């Protein structure tokens, strides 16, 4: 049984300040669209963020692929755009080391992710210490609420994130109700009977393409939302192959929102 409560209903009862804030943004903008913007220059990145900003609740970054990255030149303008357009930031870092190491990776180094990214994510392969390490780092460098997504399922062909691995990743998520806000997953992860309300964010969503030749497999917006996804993650479908980001941004925003309204019996 998938989640049928509305975003405002879930926000009211949710233990995570970050999740409450995200639900509020989603409701106010009528958007459950996350734009995945993987480009190589700060200029192109910021231009796409500014163009897509009105249509999204979340922007997903791989900040380490930007060749001319700097905190001052890349992150500070990104934060201003997040304020201008009212969206949150999700750095898709996919942490996968022991707690002490990820603590340093998250808070320090060249990227200082915990100082600017509202949400990040992690694999469960090293056990529950990864959650503790990331939570400690967040509390030490930021006064703003932070949230963690666990990688329970992936959209790529041949992914090993399934079965017992997925189950044990869910068990890791249960160790921290405040910091772990949900999953990167292809399906609903349950937990409501135990008092958990996890946000499900789903990559590999496309209105047109079925794959990319490199293992990515696309599913339709209506399919993933009906299956329990709360936020659809779209990348090249928004700005690749000569597409108009404004047109595609509104197209995906509308499709995602209508699928949510249908799942929650609002239409």
Curated annotation (Swiss-Prot):
Q: SMART domains, alphabetically?
A: OMPdecase
Pathway involvement of the protein, from the record: Pyrimidine metabolism; UMP biosynthesis via de novo pathway; UMP from orotate: step 2/2
State the top-level EC class: lyase
Q: Provide the E.C. number(s) assigned to this enzyme.
A: 4.1.1.23
Q: Where does substrate bind?
A: 38, 60-62, 92-101, 218, 236
Q: Name one GO molecular function term.
A: orotidine-5'-phosphate decarboxylase activity
Q: Which residues form the active site?
A: 94
Q: Which species expresses this protein natively?
A: Wickerhamomyces anomalus (strain ATCC 8168 / CBS 5759 / DSM 6766 / JCM 3585 / IAM 12210 / NCYC 432 / NBRC 10213 / NRRL Y-366 / AJ 5027) (Yeast)
The cysteines covalently paired via disulfide bonds are none
The UniProt entry, under InterPro entries, shows: Aldolase_TIM (IPR013785), OMPdecase (IPR014732), OMPdecase_AS (IPR018089), OMPdeCOase_dom (IPR001754), RibuloseP-bd_barrel (IPR011060)
**PANTHER family with a match to the protein in the record:** OROTATE PHOSPHORIBOSYLTRANSFERASE (PTHR19278), URIDINE 5'-MONOPHOSPHATE SYNTHASE (PTHR19278:SF9)
Specify the protein name. Orotidine 5'-phosphate decarboxylase
Per the record, the similarity remark reads: Belongs to the OMP decarboxylase family.
Lyase is among the record's keywords: yes
Keywords attached to this entry: Decarboxylase, Lyase, Pyrimidine biosynthesis
Q: Which GO terms describe its biological process?
A: 'de novo' pyrimidine nucleobase biosynthetic process; 'de novo' UMP biosynthetic process
Annotated catalysed reactions:
orotidine 5'-phosphate + H(+) = UMP + CO2
